[in-house]
Amino acid sequence: MTAEPNKPCQIKRDYPQLINLYPATAHNDAHYLSKLSIYQQRVFEAHSQQKLLVLGQMGLGNGLELLSWWRTQTNPNQRLLLKVFEPNPINAYELKLLWDQSASLAKVPELELLAQCLLHTEPTAIIGCQRLIFDDGRTTIDLHFGDIQSQLSSLIHSPLHPVQHWLVLPHLQNGLHQQIHWQMAKLSDDSATVATIGLNESSGLSETTVNRFQACGFEVRDFTCAEIQTNPQPDAILLHERHVLRRQDAKAYAFNPMAAILSSDAPSSIAIIGGGLASAHLALSLAERGQSTQIFCKDAKLGQGASGNRQGAIYPLLTPENDELSRFFQQAFLFSRRRVQALTSAPAPNQTPISHNFCGVLQTAHDERSQLRLDKIIQSQNWPSEIAYRVDAQQANCLANINIDKSGFFYPLAGWVCPYEYAEAALQKAQQLTAVKLHLETEILEIEHQSEGWYLITAKHRFGPFAQVVLANGAALTQFDASNKLQISPFRGQVSHVPAQFQLSQLATVLCANGYLTPSHEGLHCLGASYVKEPKHLDFCPQEQQENLAKMHESYPNQPWLEDIDMSGNNARVGVRMVTRDHFPMMGCAPDVAQIIKDYAEHQLTKESRHYWQTTPAPVHEGLYILGGLGSRGLSSGPLAAECLAAQLCGEPIPLDKATLCKLNPNRMWLRKLLKGKAL
């Protein structure tokens, strides 16, 4: 693993603590897993006609049930989404320690390869959902860590793909109270069942717990039962209670409409405008779901906009409060990191090269204000050490392999990635999975909505109709009438390319302070970047080149290696990133601003205005979506934002909570005011 376990801060719990929190279900793993596999095969057989089977599991245990679900899924025409809820977060190092010390995998060697694949994704001990994708999307595992009721209640019910079946592990069975049962029911199909392990043994459910599950409309059965019933309808009263819960959720978040679901019968029903990281990853996430796309790129090849830099830092944005922004970026960073690993480690000939190095990112302060901010971030939360940990000046020097003589915050799983190669690799993988048509040198000048769908218009051609159109066109996001009111701003960024020489060439990690500096790649370091709002041109700027150098001198004054930074070649690249005021990307339905203003004029002076905006879906352009505003951290945020939009378009469970989805809503700037009864 990248996060080195030999550092004291990396080891927080020993094996006795772990085995107490994540107990094995049975002493005889081989015998138990044989029975478990038979049960799981019955579950898959009972739902064999579903293209996506969504299953829930309460408790991680020692992880063998999870691995067994994965192994048992053999239907090539079915995808599996397994949602595992575990109150005690665990990281990859601890999971490996648990398996090694218990020798549980040694008893079932057929799971060893899957276990190694799982560890390779580096699960981390963060609160919230971590989405792990395997086998080109055939198996997806959502790890929901933290208080189970909070995790369940934060999720949106998926009408098209609800949870069909639950497995409850013994160590959690009697700790699940009535509110948890109802939240499980809210997310479930009306005919979903619950299976328990050891129902008739001392380790099984109490009669009270069984009654509570049944009171929520679940049929509860031991996993050794010979039959999996798929259609035990709850009585009308219990069914009504479930529907009430779902309506309450829908009403509370009515202002944030979800995407209309794609028709699987329309092979070219979605168009993506843009040729960068966002569009390529959206195409990949849709391809994993069997959905074809058409991509329209104005340039001769991908990655010529903000995705065109040689190197970009990939690490999470943390806040002292660990609020929705911070939690989103942790989830997104980890998802993106896993994407890089999956794309570069696939078996030949499906492997796609991406220049990258997860060498860590070392964040340091550059003045008194930034030091106070960094100290506040470090001290305000008990951050998982695989996310970040504090280092003193000596440790920082060792990590950087050059002297910086400053303490800092080290992100051990972070590093740098080549953005345009990342975009190209995502598209290549998408094209391996399904039909993805790429239109290069095709600049869309206008989009037009007719009754039959959307049309894309160039100087010479008219494409369409498309049921869905996604604007993922970076700096040109606001070029169309339907998107020109988006509250988002362009910022110019000039990245300097400097030769790797002398002490500078020894840099071993990404430095982030006032600007950033990467280790060398193909003989050059990247140093940047300028930050100029609403630029008038994208030409090379000598002043910004010197400003980039000055930022390094301000960040690490009097260090000898600074003299090795040679700017004389005037080698640089200029791009534009689109930035929102709250630093969240934009992902979701395109707002109909004209209609918002019209509705506002009718409701702004009424006492009921706040209630109106709270309970009324915000006006949107039907079939038009936004994926942009990735700012300076698109490498971290872009792939997960694309995955979530793909899940919405296909009517699948989304790996984000309701509050975070509202933060990503392109409508959010107006709605924040309207929901508070304030003037626009």
Swiss-Prot record:
Cell location: Cytoplasm
Pfam family, one: DAO
GO MF terms held by the record: flavin adenine dinucleotide binding; oxidoreductase activity, acting on the CH-NH group of donors; tRNA (5-methylaminomethyl-2-thiouridylate)(34)-methyltransferase activity
Cofactor: FAD
GO CC annotation terms, alphabetical: cytoplasm
Gene3D superfamilies linked: D-Amino Acid Oxidase, subunit A, domain 2 (3.30.9.10), FAD/NAD(P)-binding domain (3.50.50.60), Vaccinia Virus protein VP39 (3.40.50.150)
Record bears the keyword Transferase: yes
E.C. number: 2.1.1.61, 1.5.-.-
Catalyzed reaction equations: 5-aminomethyl-2-thiouridine(34) in tRNA + S-adenosyl-L-methionine = 5-methylaminomethyl-2-thiouridine(34) in tRNA + S-adenosyl-L-homocysteine + H(+)
Location of region: FAD-dependent cmnm(5)s(2)U34 oxidoreductase: 273-680
Region (tRNA (mnm(5)s(2)U34)-methyltransferase): 1-267
Keywords: Cytoplasm, FAD, Flavoprotein, Methyltransferase, Multifunctional enzyme, Oxidoreductase, S-adenosyl-L-methionine, Transferase, tRNA processing
Major localization listed first in the record, in broad terms: cytoplasm
GO biological processes: methylation; tRNA wobble uridine modification
Annotated coiled-coil segments of the chain: none
Keyword Ligase among UniProt keywords: no
Family: In the N-terminal section; belongs to the methyltransferase superfamily. tRNA (mnm(5)s(2)U34)-methyltransferase family.
PANTHER family (UniProt xref): SARCOSINE DEHYDROGENASE-RELATED, TRNA 5-METHYLAMINOMETHYL-2-THIOURIDINE BIOSYNTHESIS BIFUNCTIONAL PROTEIN MNMC
Function: Catalyzes the last two steps in the biosynthesis of 5-methylaminomethyl-2-thiouridine (mnm(5)s(2)U) at the wobble position (U34) in tRNA. Catalyzes the FAD-dependent demodification of cmnm(5)s(2)U34 to nm(5)s(2)U34, followed by the transfer of a methyl group from S-adenosyl-L-methionine to nm(5)s(2)U34, to form mnm(5)s(2)U34.
Name the UniProt record assigns to this protein: tRNA 5-methylaminomethyl-2-thiouridine biosynthesis bifunctional protein MnmC
Species the sequence originates in: Shewanella putrefaciens (strain CN-32 / ATCC BAA-453)
Taxonomic lineage of the native organism: Bacteria, Pseudomonadati, Pseudomonadota, Gammaproteobacteria, Alteromonadales
Gene name tied to this protein: mnmC
